[in-house]
Amino acid sequence: MSDNTTLAPPAASQAPATPRKGPPKFKQRQTRQFKSKPPKKGVKGFGDDIPGMEGLGTDITVICPWEAFSHLELHELAQFGII
């Protein structure tokens, strides 16, 4: 065998046939879009339909915000960012 037939490794400066891409980049949405509408304040079933409470109406001052959403579950309040 002759000394002129040595195998040389490929040049390091050669780029691969397909360039490697990094992981896909996701953009953060500025606003959150919900498929359903957020709940409205107020207790379901409270108002003029209660005997003896006709004159009070449905405009009730809510001391605790939890009272305004007492008809909802905790996961529903968390879904819309109320709690």
Curated annotation (Swiss-Prot):
GO terms for molecular function: 3',5'-cyclic-GMP phosphodiesterase activity; cGMP binding. Residues 22-43 have a biased composition (Basic residues). It catalyses: 3',5'-cyclic GMP + H2O = GMP + H(+). Residues 1-19 have a biased composition (Low complexity). Residues 1-51 are annotated as: Disordered. InterPro entries: PDE6_gamma, PDE6_gamma_sf. GO terms for cellular component: photoreceptor outer segment membrane. One of its GO terms (biological process) is visual perception. Keywords: cGMP, Hydrolase, Sensory transduction, Vision. The keyword Hydrolase applies. Tetramer composed of two catalytic chains (alpha and beta), and two inhibitory chains (gamma). Participates in processes of transmission and amplification of the visual signal. cGMP-PDEs are the effector molecules in G-protein-mediated phototransduction in vertebrate rods and cones. The C-terminal region is important in conferring inhibition. PANTHER family: RETINAL CONE RHODOPSIN-SENSITIVE CGMP 3',5'-CYCLIC PHOSPHODIESTERASE GAMMA-SUBUNIT-RELATED (PTHR12122), RETINAL CONE RHODOPSIN-SENSITIVE CGMP 3',5'-CYCLIC PHOSPHODIESTERASE SUBUNIT GAMMA (PTHR12122:SF5). Belongs to the rod/cone cGMP-PDE gamma subunit family. This is Retinal cone rhodopsin-sensitive cGMP 3',5'-cyclic phosphodiesterase subunit gamma.
